[in-house]
């Protein structure tokens, strides 16, 4: 005799008890259907099966039979083998996409996830956190950009790097993604300058309260908007508002974005055979950022853009680390346990006692500035670099210095000459 599951047998016996009462006319058939929670049509079908086959007629005939939708055993083994041998470190969503793209396997995501869970390859997801309301996106690209870094083993070999990412709040489009040794003032400035040169000036920047973004006098407390970091000073010069985030939940859009990066980029780098930062950054720039945006970017709520094209010629100066120094009597300034010698200037006999600015550029060269004048250019270790001779213009020496320093464009000087 065919083995009947205990649960199925118990269910059939309960149905039988109700049907016996209906057969004995203690209750009507529609009352029996109401007790069992089924329709009158199903009740008639069960009554016919019971009269013809007895208790066995009440069993679900699908029980114990393989579903016609069931995957062939060979295909099931192929999926498990692919995950075990080739995609062992992929998350389920990423693995499912590869099955469709690379192997022409079109089972549903949920089915693939259940197969991997049943085989013990992945664990069931943790219980979700309490519901939080999502902040609406900004309607236009360029209104708000997120910047953050993710410290992770991107090569899965014990080496830790920061992935520095800038994304648009309106579309989740990635404008910049590069691996760096650490998230710092210099790497953040390089990223922001890249976006401004490629896209234009944006309205606001949303970030955590790391020391290169904000001064926070008390740990966990509010930021001090009166004191500005080097990044804060650069953003103020460009008219970009900086908005601090006070919790990981407040940075939810960026945090979710990094979960996606951590679940995909290490595996993509492994498949591409990339093991170093230089090639990884080239891969990101030339290939992966575009693929990522095609899959995860969304359309903005409104047409248009909030980016404003910039004609500024002084981005080298803006995106530099600036230090104020007092010129000593011998026309030198202190720098990094050494001195920088200011060369004689035709427009002033001595600069002793003047306050000057040392500009530490992203390429690690140094410049000394006094107002609109450049007083010298140096390597990182203080070696003097030769400067090109200034071109004479009708605008005079001051405008020539301004153009060299990037405070006005060459077009402005040309129009003045005319």
Task: Indicate residue ranges for each PLM-predicted region.
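Acidic/histidine-rich, metal-coordinating catalytic segments
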Residues: 196-224, 245-248
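C-terminal, beta-rich DNA-binding module of retroviral/retroelements integrases
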Residues: 287-418
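Mobile genetic element proteins and their domesticated derivatives, centered on retroelements
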Residues: 18, 32, 43-46, 54, ...
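A generic structural motif
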Residues: 167, 180-181, 346, 381
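Residue-centric detector for conserved, function-critical "anchor" positions
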Residues: 1-42, 47-62, 86
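Mobile-element integrase/transposase regions
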Residues: 74, 85, 105-106, 117-174, ...
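Charged alpha-helix within mobile-element recombinases
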Residues: 224, 230-302, 306-317
